[in-house]
């Protein structure tokens, strides 16, 4: 009673009966501090003080969806302002920091049914409004306004903050009194004509080129080309920040200081969902300010190489010990030590101790087997590259007039003894030969790349045989370099084949490592960054600019955009920037993003559909009798098997949902917002490819269903498949090295003699050939963070707000989607327990769970942290 009395006095009122002509409501707000790195469990009284300010500090005015005001241009009638009243003290579970307030509105039936609310913040600080719920609305019952938005003091805006009820309307179906509000809100978000620089409170979605990666004002070494806006270096667009150009180059945007993570994204795109998500930016900052000095302190007091595999294991079993106490003290001053402690557990003087990667948890040596090397092409962190070999020897797509002949040097003589009784021609006809081909990817860049300090990179081809038991075995690896007399002369190549004993077995291990270096770089640069993060951002921007929040397609896609603009902005600031962590740890170095631009020239939106991709790579063939319309040629291909059923579930959900609003193609063609959205995606967001003939015309519901399925697939399942296995597979870097620094040892050299002697000496040759000690520690410190699920993760088949729509048909369809995903979870667990499916676990005994939806984990208890499982809705890390 004392607490209630405090609130009564604070709000200047006592509890009183609800009067006639009033609508009761509850508003859920979150104070500013809770979504930062302060006290996550701020006290209730602090929450009231920070949110309420004074009793009229937050005002709500309802807008009628059915009654027009002739004196206000026919807009919906506006109700009188209502203010936050007493805070609801409840023992029910509310998220940390949430406060629930009562609100009472003067409203009668003559004003019709509320369809929007205008919110005004007269306080000094912003707050986060989650929802406003009205009960007992005449003629309607319950009305829910889902805001999920930061509301700043009113003097920051030149417009009113308007939120719509959770009803869904095509533009032609929008209640007339609300149409002006719908149009004005879209104009505000477009911000056309507002060049910036944009402020923290801004909500502007505009496009820009990738022109903010370099720092020409700091010298030529930090100059990077502008990506996007040209045929030479095309690229998807990113969100505009409005920052000024550099002094040296007017085409390059100036950058914030490295450790300033307040790079502009529209306010509601910023991490505001707390805990691990919001913590990510600070973790990256901790790496730069905390981990780098620790690593340098460590490597400066020891040789700059690991001395053995046990030396590497010490990262997980013993940790790094910092001998220089003063250096550690300085680090503690520069970064709040709690951050480093949370990021990297501290035990005594063991400052950096990393969790044991899944790939070596059960067996420390199984990663070295040929079986595991091949299996990871089907169930590893980059399972999207393997292709069926259709010609032997393998052909090149490089222009022979420029590059000469790059036909593979692998001959039948190299592999016939290992073909399990098959001839090459029989194996080709029987769909038994496959290839991991990075030759053409890297060859045009190798001259430049190998001039970078510390690099000796080959372009690789790996040929594999599909065995009778459904597993793959490598037959040969071809390593190639540009011809010393010029690229027009083709390549200088050497072929290596499997061996189990002697120096040949050591050479074979190195050959696999060189091939893995290629695959690691391609994975990070193309499979991960370009094909998920970069290509999705234009859809995020276009959706917010052209589709109202009440549009059915906006409601369908918005969960799959959560945090994407923010993580991409942080990537530009600290990861893919000039001399950033990516350039420090992966071999293409400063040419990395330029390479990804060349690859983007051949990107096709329609080929991102999983069934299309599998057929294109030759690992599946069309089959109209299959529910997925394709049949896999590698039956035990975990990524494809799980991916196809996930794809099917997404496509079915999207089809059922869109059918509610688009009963025929004519309705779709007449949807002006949808048509403007697709036009902008094609002509602006992916504008460098706008003239390609593969773009869907967006004339049919089928085209929209396929397009939305592709968008959701990329943002959820594809990203999960290539992201959350990073630390589990590559956290032990010998399994997935990112750099090779020395050529393959040749007979007569000291390195070759060490390989002949075997044992520790041979191990050292391997260790000193791959990623350096500094690069290893920095790289795996980063991917540990990037492989973690946040504590507030929202998985496929879940929504962060249960009241995301008022449409019962849509809610029922979504429930069916969730049920299908839970069935898929059980199916995946059953397959992982089937010993006949050898690729599901492999020699390392690591079940393939990267496409396990984790929809059933509503408490988020199973899915938090480094789990190597779960499909989040969006690219949020």
Swiss-Prot record:
Pfam families: Lipoxygenase (PF00305), PLAT (PF01477). Plant lipoxygenase may be involved in a number of diverse aspects of plant physiology including growth and development, pest resistance, and senescence or responses to wounding. Catalyzes the hydroperoxidation of lipids containing a cis,cis-1,4-pentadiene structure. CDD domains: PLAT_LH2. Its EC number is 1.13.11.58. It comes from Oryza sativa subsp. japonica. GO terms for biological process: fatty acid biosynthetic process; lipid oxidation; oxylipin biosynthetic process. Belongs to the lipoxygenase family. It comes from the Eukaryota. This is Probable linoleate 9S-lipoxygenase 4. One of its GO terms (molecular function) is metal ion binding. Residues 38-165 form the PLAT domain. Residues 168-877 form the Lipoxygenase domain. Fe cation binds at residues 528, 533, 719, 723, 877. It catalyses: (9Z,12Z)-octadecadienoate + O2 = (9S)-hydroperoxy-(10E,12Z)-octadecadienoate. Pathway: Lipid metabolism; oxylipin biosynthesis. The keyword Iron applies. Keywords: Dioxygenase, Fatty acid biosynthesis, Fatty acid metabolism, Iron, Lipid biosynthesis, Lipid metabolism, Metal-binding, Oxidoreductase, Oxylipin biosynthesis. Its cofactor is Fe cation. Residues 229-252 are annotated as: Disordered. InterPro entries: LipOase (IPR000907), LipOase_C (IPR013819), LipOase_C_sf (IPR036226), LipOase_CS (IPR020834), LipOase_Fe_BS (IPR020833), LipOase_plant (IPR001246), Lipoxy_PLAT/LH2 (IPR042057), Lipoxygenase_dom_3 (IPR027433). Binds 1 Fe cation per subunit. Iron is tightly bound.
């Amino acid at each position: 009673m004392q607490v209630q009395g405090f609130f009564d006095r604070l709000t200047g009122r006592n509890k009183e009966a609800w009067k006639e002509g009033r609508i009761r409501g509850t508003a859920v707000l979150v104070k500013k501090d809770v979504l930062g790195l302060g006290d996550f469990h701020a006290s209730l009284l602090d929450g009231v003080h920070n949110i309420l300010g004074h009793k009229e500090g937050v005002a709500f005015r309802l807008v009628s969806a059915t009654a027009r005001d002739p004196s206000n241009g026919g807009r919906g009638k506006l109700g009188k302002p209502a203010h936050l009243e007493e805070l609801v003290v409840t023992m029910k579970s509310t998220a940390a920091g949430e406060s629930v307030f009562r609100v009472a509105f003067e409203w009668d039936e003559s004003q019709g049914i509320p369809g929007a609310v205008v919110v005004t913040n007269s306080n000094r600080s912003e707050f986060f409004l989650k929802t406003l719920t009205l009960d007992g609305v005449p003629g309607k019952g319950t009305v829910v306004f889902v805001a999920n938005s930061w509301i700043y003091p009113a003097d920051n805006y030149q417009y009113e903050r308007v939120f719509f009820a959770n009803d869904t309307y095509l533009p032609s179906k929008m209640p007339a009194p609300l149409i002006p509000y719908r149009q004005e809100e879209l104009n505000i978000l477009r911000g056309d004509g507002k060049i910036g620089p944009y402020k923290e409170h801004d909500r502007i979605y505009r496009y820009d080129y990738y022109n903010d990666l370099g720092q020409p004002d700091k010298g030529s070494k930090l100059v990077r080309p502008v990506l996007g806006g040209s045929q030479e270096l095309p690229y998807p667009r990113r969100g505009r920040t409005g920052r000024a150009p550099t002094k040296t180059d007017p085409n390059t945007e100036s950058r914030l200081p490295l450790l300033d993570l307040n790079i502009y994204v529209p306010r509601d795109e910023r991490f505001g969902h707390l805990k691990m998500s919001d913590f990510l930016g600070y973790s990256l900052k901790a790496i730069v300010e905390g981990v780098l000095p620790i690593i340098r302190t460590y490597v400066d007091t020891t040789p700059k190489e690991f001395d053995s595999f046990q030396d590497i294991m010490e990262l997980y079993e013993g940790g790094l010990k910092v001998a220089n106490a003063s250096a550690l003290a300085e680090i503690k001053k520069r970064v709040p030590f709690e951050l480093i402690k949370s990021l990297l557990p501290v035990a005594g003087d063991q400052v950096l101790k990393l969790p044991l990667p899944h790939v070596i948890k059960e067996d420390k040596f199984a990663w070295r087997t040929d079986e595991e090397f091949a299996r990871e092409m089907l169930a590893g962190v980059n399972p999207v590259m393997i292709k069926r070999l259709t010609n032997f020897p393998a052909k090149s797509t490089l222009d022979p007039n420029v590059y000469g002949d790059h036909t593979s040097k692998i001959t039948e003589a190299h592999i016939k003894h290992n073909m399990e009784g098959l001839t090459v021609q029989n194996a080709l006809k029987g769909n038994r030969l496959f290839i991991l081909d990075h030759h053409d990817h890297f060859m045009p860049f190798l001259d430049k790349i190998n001039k970078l300090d510390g690099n000796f990179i080959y372009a690789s081809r790996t040929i594999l045989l599909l065995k009778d038991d459904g597993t793959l075995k490598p037959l040969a690896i071809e390593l190639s370099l540009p011809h010393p007399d010029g690229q027009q002369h083709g390549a200088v190549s050497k072929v290596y084949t499997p061996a189990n004993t002697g120096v040949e077995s050591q050479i074979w291990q190195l050959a696999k490592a060189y091939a893995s270096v290629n695959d690691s770089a391609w994975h990070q640069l193309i499979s991960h960054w370009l094909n998920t993060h970069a290509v999705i951002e234009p859809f995020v921007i276009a959706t917010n600019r052209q589709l109202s929040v009440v549009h059915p397609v906006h409601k369908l896609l918005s969960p799959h955009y959560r945090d994407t603009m923010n993580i991409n902005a942080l990537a530009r600031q600290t990861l893919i920037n000039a001399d950033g962590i990516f350039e420090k740890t992966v071999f293409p170095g400063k040419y990395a993003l330029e390479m990804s631009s060349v690859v983007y020239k051949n990107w096709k939106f329609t080929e991102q559909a999983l069934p299309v991709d599998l057929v294109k790579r030759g690992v599946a063939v069309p089959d109209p009798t299959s529910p997925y319309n394709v049949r896999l040629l590698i039956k035990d291909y975990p990524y494809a098997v799980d991916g196809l059923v996930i794809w099917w579930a997404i496509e079915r959900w999207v089809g059922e949902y869109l059918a509610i609003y688009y009963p025929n193609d004519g309705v779709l063609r007449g949807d002006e917002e949808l048509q403007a959205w697709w036009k902008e995606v094609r002509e602006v967001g992916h504008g460098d490819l706008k003239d390609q003939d593969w773009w869907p015309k967006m004339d049919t519901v089928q085209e929209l269903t396929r397009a939305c399925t592709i968008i959701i697939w990329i943002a959820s399942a594809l990203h999960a498949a290539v992201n959350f296995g990073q630390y589990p597979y590559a956290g032990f870097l010998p399994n997935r090295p990112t750099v090779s620094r020395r050529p393959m040892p040749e007979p007569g050299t000291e390195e070759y003699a060490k390989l002949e002697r075997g044992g520790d000496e041979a191990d050292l040759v391997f260790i000193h050939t791959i990623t350096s000690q500094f690069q290893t520690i920095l790289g795996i410190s980063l991917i540990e963070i990037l492989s973690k699920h946040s504590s507030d993760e929202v998985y496929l088949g879940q929504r962060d707000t249960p009241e995301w729509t008022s449409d019962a048909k849509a809610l029922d369809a979504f429930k069916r989607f969730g049920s299908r995903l839970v069935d898929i979870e059980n199916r995946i667990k059953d397959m992982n327990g089937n010993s006949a499916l050898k690729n599901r676990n492999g020699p390392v005994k690591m079940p393939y769970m990267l496409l396990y939806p984790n929809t059933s984990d509503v408490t988020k208890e199973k899915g938090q942290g480094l789990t190597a499982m779960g499909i989040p809705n969006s690219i949020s890390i």
